[in-house]
């Protein structure tokens, strides 16, 4: 099982992943960005604005996740924004072909809530603000593609993690 936490930059995916891991025995956080960091020095001569645009990134994310799940026997929690529909489908298809069940969670909120959260954190503020428009453009299909949409606007990080844990079959008491 892989729980994929999607949403715009600054929506709380990483915090949710860490809280969810604490709630779910036999789970671990897998950060797909580490695959991008591995590719960066190897594809330095192939400039892209985001490593998700490198064609090898997507199948390597799926393969890495599948191998980690197979090796550890644990559920994976992946906090990763993916705003390109074809990219997400490519990754999820690879995960499913490797035998993993995918549960796609979208952490969502209105623009004013997201901007307030982003302004409240110095970490990557400009990057996060610059990508809000991309999230808004993808929001409709993301909502349709998600197994669970969580409005983070009025929930604490613990409440978000609890809601996810209860909604994912086989993870929580729900």
List PLM regions with ranges.
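Hydrophobic anchor at the beta1->P-loop junction of P-loop NTPases
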Residues: 5
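The conserved Walker
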Residues: 9
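Conserved glycine(s) of the Walker
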Residues: 12
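Conserved substrate/cofactor phosphate-moiety recognition/catalytic segment
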Residues: 15-63
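Glycine-rich phosphate-binding loop used to anchor ATP phosphates in small-molecule kinases
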Residues: 53-103
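Short, amphipathic alpha-helical "lid/cap" segments that border enzyme active or binding sites
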Residues: 58, 62, 157-168
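Small-molecule kinase domains that catalyze NTP-dependent phosphoryl transfer to phosphate-bearing small molecules
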Residues: 116, 120-163, 174
């Amino acid at each position: 099982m892989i729980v994929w936490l999607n949403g715009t930059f600054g929506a709380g995916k990483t915090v949710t992943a860490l809280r969810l891991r604490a709630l779910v025995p036999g789970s671990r956080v897998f950060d797909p960005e580490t695959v991008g960091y591995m590719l960066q020095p190897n594809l330095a001569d192939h400039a892209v604005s985001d490593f998700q645009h490198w064609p090898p990134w997507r199948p390597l994310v799926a393969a890495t996740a599948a191998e980690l799940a197979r090796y550890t026997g644990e559920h994976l929690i992946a906090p990763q924004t993916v705003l390109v529909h074809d990219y997400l489908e490519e990754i999820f298809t690879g995960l499913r072909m490797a035998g993993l069940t995918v549960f796609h969670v979208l952490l969502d909120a209105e623009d004013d809530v997201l901007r307030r959260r982003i302004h409240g954190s110095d970490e990557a503020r400009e990057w996060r603000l610059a990508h809000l428009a991309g999230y808004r453009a993808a929001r409709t299909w993301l909502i349709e593609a998600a197994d669970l949409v969580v409005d983070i606007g009025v929930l604490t990080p613990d409440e978000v993690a609890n809601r996810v844990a209860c909604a994912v079959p086989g993870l929580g008491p729900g």
